[in-house]
């Protein structure tokens, strides 16, 4: 990996819609990080027993074959924040 790309294997949040995921061999994900760098394009969550951030600045598509087991799910309030943040990043910025 180059620059500031996240290189190591890490958990992530699938952000592509279920309807899309059903038909494609890839899913769109945002990696989770324990780096608590507080900027508006990262969303704070509690995962795997610790506080962390969804790194929406590192969104990417990956093959479904690279996915591991599901470790949890998000609350609707967290999903709304993620959607708002993505909209702000790519539409309203």
Residue ranges of each PLM-predicted region?
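Conserved functional hotspots at enzyme active or ligand-binding sites that engage polyanionic ligands
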Residues: 1-93
